[in-house]
Amino acid sequence: MPTINQLVRKPRKSKIEKSDSPALNIGYNSHKKVQTKMAAPQKRGVATRVGTMTPKKPNSALRKFARVRLSNLIEVTAYIPGIGHNLQEHSVVLIRGGRVKDLPGVRYHIVRGALDTAGVADRNKAVLNTGRNVQKDNRRGIRENES
């Protein structure tokens, strides 16, 4: 434990909070050609490379990723979620924060259905099971076995 005199000479430093997605906290002034402190929830970018990579040790797969040059001139690696995608080089994409735990260096996700990225094809929403025997063509949800 430090003495009062030691704390007077050298005060305690507060912890610096590190961002999980630092590229989203930087803007770019193209007129002055300088980076600015302008945070954003998403950023637009151009895919410079689209490919697959293998995950860390216990998992095994081919995860799809894209290398993206953002509008603030920072280049990041972003994960392409969902089954199948239509991204190519020079596709304009929207990225959001959020890492992929088993892919080292991937701290961003591409937003499906925004800009050049198509949504996931043939994706079905889960049907809530209410415990009733309802026929498929019975659209109003009236019970079948009522008399």
Swiss-Prot record:
GO terms for molecular function: rRNA binding; structural constituent of ribosome; tRNA binding. Keywords: Methylation, Ribonucleoprotein, Ribosomal protein, RNA-binding, rRNA-binding, tRNA-binding. InterPro entries: NA-bd_OB-fold (IPR012340), Ribosomal_uS12 (IPR006032), Ribosomal_uS12_bac (IPR005679). The keyword NAD does not apply. Coiled coil: none annotated. GO terms for cellular component: small ribosomal subunit. SUPFAM superfamilies: Nucleic acid-binding proteins. Residues 1-22 are annotated as: Disordered. PROSITE patterns: RIBOSOMAL_S12 (PS00055). One of its GO terms (biological process) is translation. The keyword rRNA-binding applies. HAMAP family: Ribosomal_uS12_B. Part of the 30S ribosomal subunit. Contacts proteins S8 and S17. May interact with IF1 in the 30S initiation complex. This is Small ribosomal subunit protein uS12. It comes from Streptococcus pyogenes serotype M12 (strain MGAS2096). The gene is rpsL.
